[in-house]
Amino acid sequence: MKPTLFLLAAGMGSRYGGLKQLDGLGPNGETIMDYSIYDAINAGFGKLVFVIRKDFEQDFRDKIISKYEGHIPCELVFQSIDDLPEGFTCPEGRTKPWGTNHAVMMGADVIKEPFAVINCDDFYGRDSFQVMGKFLAALPEGSKNVYSMVGFRIGNTLSESGTVSRGLCGTDANNLLTSVVERTKIQRMDGEVKYIDDNGEWTATPETTPVSMNFWGFTPDYFAYSAEFFKSFLSDPKNMENLKSEFFIPLMVDKLINDGTATCEVLDTTSKWFGVTYPEDRQSVVDKIQALVDAGEYPAK
C-alpha cells in the first residue's frame, strides 16, 4: 500500500508576511509545496491530504488542488479552533490554532495507511522523501507503534539571515529517538554551529547533529493516541488559560516514546533544508531552487 503525504497548511507564517504557502518561488511560480509533492510522488507516495483553514478553501482549491487532481488522489481536511472533543469549549479570546498535532488529528477520517507529515513551507529536498518513503513502504501490513522522523543534519538547516530555533534530537544506539530539545538562537560562528544553552552560554554542536524539521512518519494508530492525549492537554488548566498554548507533534511523540508505547526511528538524510524564515531569505531560496532546476533535479516547467 502506498503511503500518504499529509501536508500541514493551516498555519499562517508569523515571521514572514503573507500566505507563504502560496508564494511562487520556482522559475514558473512553483511553491515550495509543489517541490515537496513532486519529490513525494517520485518517492512512492500515493495520496495527498492537506489540512487548511476552511475560509481558505476556495483559494486553495483553485491554486493548489487543481494542479494535482487527476494526477494523484487529493483530500482536503480543515482545522478550526472550535474542533474540540466533547465536553471542551474554546476559551474566549483564543484566536491561535491548537498546534501541529491538533492539525494532524484532522486527518483521522481520511488516512487509513502509513503516512508522512510535513510543513508546507519547508523545502525538505529529494533525499528526505526517499528515506521516509522507503521506511513507510517497508512497514508490514497492519504495523502499529513504529514511527519515524527525518533527522536533518543541523549544519544543513541554518538561515543566512539570522538565528533559527531547532529541535535537537537525542538518539540511542539503534537510531531511535530518545529526546527532542528545542534550542534557540542557532547559527554558524567561527566555523562552528552554536546555540545558546540553558545557562545562556554559546555551546558548539557537531554539524551532523540530527534536528527535527517536522517531517514525521506515522501509522494510523497515532490518531487514537492523539485524540486521547489531547483531552489530557485540554484538561490542564494552564493550557486553557494560556491563549497561545499549542499541542505540538513532539509533545505527543515524546509521551509515546517515554511511556514505551511506540518507537520513533531517526532517519538520516543528506538533504539540505531551506525555507523562508525571514523575508530576507526569499531571494536565497529562489536562487537555490533555480540551481536545483539547472542541475536537472527538478523539471524546468
What is the role of each PLM region?
Residues M12, D121-D122, I154:
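Active-site metal-binding loops of divalent metal-dependent hydrolases
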Residues R126-W216, P220:
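Conserved core of the sugar-phosphate nucleotidyltransferase
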Residues D59-F60, D127, Y225, M252, ...:
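Phosphate- and divalent-cation-binding pockets in alpha/beta enzyme and binding domains
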Residues M1-A10, P27-V117, Y124-V131, A137-A138:
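Conserved N-terminal catalytic core of the sugar/cofactor nucleotidyltransferase
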Residues L22, C169-T171, V266:
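A structural signal for short hydrophobic beta-strand segments in well-ordered beta-sheet cores
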Residues S226-A262:
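A C-terminal functional module that forms or caps the active site or interfaces directly
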Residues P210, E265-S271:
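Catalytic beta-strand/loop signature of glycosyltransferases that borders the donor
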